[in-house]
A protein has these predicted regions:
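Short glycine/proline- and aromatic-enriched beta-strand/turn motifs that initiate or cap beta-hairpins
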Residues: 1-23, 102, 216-222, 226-232
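Outer-membrane beta-barrel proteins
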Residues: 2-8, 42-47, 80, 100-105, ...
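Extracellular loop and loop/strand-boundary signature of outer-membrane beta-barrel proteins
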Residues: 2-9, 52-60, 78, 126-132, ...
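Residues that define the transmembrane beta-barrel architecture of outer-membrane proteins
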Residues: 12-16, 63-67, 87, 136-140, ...
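Residues on the lipid-exposed face of transmembrane beta-strands in outer-membrane beta-barrel proteins
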Residues: 20-24, 67-75, 93-95, 142-148, ...
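Repeated loop/turn-to-beta-strand initiation elements of outer-membrane beta-barrel proteins
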Residues: 29-32, 79, 152-156, 232-234
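Gram-negative (and chloroplast) outer-membrane scaffold detector with strong preference
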Residues: 30, 36-116
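Outer-membrane beta-barrel transmembrane domain signature
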Residues: 96-214
């Protein structure tokens, strides 16, 4: 799930993910993990408990590809194949690079990429300070979970992790409306409609569309079956 202008509640509007990971245990306390995760983030204002957000009537989906490197710390000694050290809670942090491309569904049922449209005036002469956001960016992952050794070669890992991003455009919503009069000069008719879908009619230029003071976050929870192969651990992540 994601946290931002269209969703302010943890675990709400969650979607499945899939991925693969590689883990190198340095000792019983520390490990390095790299992972590749693919997921879809989604939110719709109609699911909000905030009446202003419901009236804003925006929604998006965003397919995320997340490549991460992390350092894990085990609170208890942990070693697969050693009956003395069969479970531990752990925490992790690291760095990720992710690719994203927010889309919205138009009235014809087609999903339209939002970044090229500059829905808040990005890349237009009137809003010189608003540049089009990058579709590949860095973020900071951190979280924790539990490791349980099933046998000498297999373990099960549950983890919850959240990503702190440095963009407010996971959902393509951040600042203000451009206004109908200005939009008519710069945008196609579809761009104008996707910029402002308010139920009570078009907003004025400068009206708040999102909260520019906060950045977006996204989060994963996963259950991993990890196995040893040639003294290395590899895993496959099903999730909810």
């Amino acid at each position: 799930y994601y946290l931002g202008d269209l969703n302010e509640t943890h675990f709400k509007q969650s979607k499945p993910l899939g991925g693969i990971s590689f883990r190198k245990n340095f000792d019983r306390r520390f490990a390095f993990k790299s992972s590749l995760i693919y997921s879809m983030l989604y939110a719709h204002d109609k699911n909000s408990s905030n009446a202003e957000h419901v009236n804003r009537n925006l929604h998006f989906r965003n397919y995320i590809i997340d490549l991460s490197g992390q350092i894990e710390f085990n609170f208890l000694p942990y070693e697969i194949g050693n009956p003395k050290y069969t479970w531990t809670p752990f925490v992790f942090t690291g760095v990720s690079i992710f690719n994203h491309n927010p889309e919205t569904e138009n009235d014809n049922g087609e999903w339209i990429a939002l970044q090229p449209l500059g829905t808040e005036g990005q890349g237009t002469p009137f809003y010189n300070g608003r540049k089009k956001y990058a579709l590949t960016q860095f973020c900071l992952p951190f979280g924790g979970g539990m490791k349980i050794a099933i046998n000498k070669d297999l373990n099960m890992i549950f983890e919850y992790g959240i990503r702190k991003t440095f963009t407010d455009y996971i959902d393509d919503v951040s600042t203000t409306y451009v206004g109908v009069d200005y939009a008519a000069q710069e945008f196609t008719s579809e761009s104008i409609h996707l910029n402002d879908r308010s139920l009570d009619g078009p907003k004025m230029q400068g009206d708040d569309r999102g909260n520019r003071l906060t950045k977006d976050w996204y989060s994963f929870s996963s259950l991993t079956l990890s196995f040893k192969l040639n003294n290395k651990e590899k895993g496959c992540n099903p999730s909810n």
